[in-house]
Amino acid sequence: MLGTPATEDAAGGSWSGARKLVLCVIDGVAPQMLERAVEEERAPAIARFIEDGVYVDDCVSAFPSITPVCAATIATGTAQDQHLIPNMNWYHRGEARYVEYGSSFAASRTFGIHRSLLDTIYNMNLAHLSPDVQTVFESLDDADVRTAGTTFLIYRGRHRHEIARETPITGLLNRTLFRHGVWGPRELFYADVFASRRTGCRSQLGLPGVRDQHTGCVGSYLVEHDLFDFLLFSLPDNDTHSHKTGPEGQVESIAGADRELQRLADAAGGMDAFLEAHAIIVMGDHSQVLIEDRISLGEAFAAWKVRRPVGPEDGAEIAVCPAQRSAGLYVIDEERRDELLPELVGTALETPGVDLVLRHDDGEAVITSAQGELRFAPDGPLADVRGGTWSVRGDFAVLELQSAHGGVWSDEYPDALARAWAAVTCPTSGDLLLSAAPGYEFTDWGGADHVGGGSHGSLHRSDSQGVLLWCGTGPDRREARPQWTLRDVAPMVRQHFGL
């Protein structure tokens, strides 16, 4: 699919071949809500992309199906057993401390706002994301493709960016809180912290409800001035809106996201002109499910000495890491590991709202639920939908697995074996991982939850199946893959540019 060649700008670097590519990530968009928005004519830009392109309504998320893990998978094409970003909240064994990427303002305040911001903005990319995997920015930068990105959790690239000081308030904050440069795409616009050039666009320091407008402003500027071959166009406000209103409220926030996509097209001279020069991928990172009840891990594991949010370990036995509809438990007292793990599994299974308990044991993944215990490992006689092979034994009812003609699959827990295996074998994951039942969410360290609203994070299909559509790139039919996942997006981007 050939289009107009890219034009070299004063920043240097050029690429000619396929048309430019925009990767748009609408955080938390539920397929049924996107379809409703299109049906109600609230999303005309997306409707055009669907009409001219290929639409997938069941693209499988990562597990935990939570934004930092999903963002790293989208950006690298790998799961966390390779990229090493395990969850929204996790315990850093090497540094003997919690890492909190911003579950809520209250959770960040519990661990220290400054520490949470440093982990989210700096350490996630520069220390926590594995150096052994490449982001799409790094791959394309190495090929001299002009890269650009708006505020997205994973931004690591080959170009150096210093902190922005465009306004007095951002200058003050960036002198006191953020003092160091980062490596990102050629054009990086991350809230008001990093901006590779003056655009006149403001995000009010990444304030929810303003972030999509900032992305639209920056994106239209980049299109108008021909400053990219590849743009990661991040629209996070849908997720925030859905957390408050529940998934049924997404039509309004999807309409807002669509306006920013139309703004991008208008900067190119209208939708026809935009699609003549650009291919586009539009996707969600996960879906959301309505939350009706909460799970307090503090109460459930009160019998153990739980590591406190700050300060020394002081004889703590375990660390507890709630992350919306997923959670991790880390054994700190290594000498008592064999004693503690069975007790922790038993307590987790007795906790109302906990659906699955996952762990790694003697070369196998083990998932336990009220239905029994299931064990599995790669390289066996059963093939999953994507062609991975597994040895599986135990109670298939744990994951509602079906098996026939040498195949194994689950409708309730899509791509369950591969996702669970990546999670339990990730070196930074908890010793136990918990997945909540539909309708339940783990209260975070700040006491916040989304009861009455939406949330995500589990292995269940309700928050694990999302949107993926493409236009002007990729295969001609969704049937090109028997099952699409987040891991397929980075390869599609690289292939678009001949890599």
Regions found by a protein language model. Name each.
Residues L2-Y55, S65:
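Active-site-proximal N-terminal segment of extracellular/periplasmic enzymes that hydrolyze or transfer
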Residues I26, E41, D57, P64-I66, ...:
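Secreted, luminal/periplasmic, and some membrane-associated catalytic domains
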Residues T78-K244, A377-P378, L382-S410, S429, ...:
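His/Asp/Glu-rich, glycine-adjacent segments
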Residues V306-E335, G453-M492, H496:
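Substrate-binding rim/cap in mid-to-C-terminal beta-strand-loop elements of soluble/periplasmic
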Residues D444-S455:
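Short, surface-exposed loop/helix-turn segments at secondary-structure junctions
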